[in-house]
Amino acid sequence: MGYKALLVDRVDGIATLTMNRPEARNALDIQMREDLVSALDEIERDPATRVVVLTGAGGHFSAGGDVKSMAARRHSAAEGRERVEMLNRFVLRLFNFPKPTIAMVDGFAVGAGCNIALGCDMIIASDRAKFGEVLLKIGLVPDGGGTWLLQRLVGLAKAKEMVLTAEIIDAAEALRIGLVNRVVPAVELEATTRALAGRIAAGPPLAATLAKSLLNRAATVDLAAALEGEAFGQSNAISSEDHAEGVRAFLEKRAPKFQGR
């Protein structure tokens, strides 16, 4: 399927989605938002794809909302809600996507651009990456899940500081506060991310989907509910062909060949 604002590449079980508006630092216009949702729908149906990498073209991840389109005319409250709900559908889809997702961040990831990175399961950043909840600078509030996602990574107090000051932080600070998983030199960003994605893609797809769902759910339920979820997940995993293959491979001292069944 062709997209106007997105490049999609699939190799060795890894689908790379590249936001492709480099002239606008990959600002999230309506076309980009539509393309992102459609791409996830397409990739979910592809059994050969096991991991998704989300990134941006031209040396930046995403500058967030398209400020130029905002400046073109004043939007009504109803129009504003419609635009945000389109973004929110993508972030919710991304967070709950059954396949593992990795944000590969170079350059700016600010505003909604920061929040779609936070919606991924992991963030690998280059040493020149910048992150920020900057919407207060233009009289707006965080959207795209920023109020929910950010505090779960960095804590409520730090999240409030980032939002209310609209400060942009560098990659080293993002790593220090737990916003990102790893920071690597820019020249190593793609290789590092692909190595991580490849390692995950080589694992059991069914168990990965179940484990991701359990971890997401556990963040908002008590221990008893989390334990019940684990019992349900394990009852599905233990009866799978992948589990049998994993046990055989362990006993035979070889690499397993998981099929997602």
What are these model-derived regions, one by one?
Residues M1-A57, L92:
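Conserved CoA-thioester-binding segment of acyl-CoA-metabolizing enzymes
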Residues L92-A208, A231, S235, S239-S240, ...:
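Crotonase-fold acyl-CoA enzyme core
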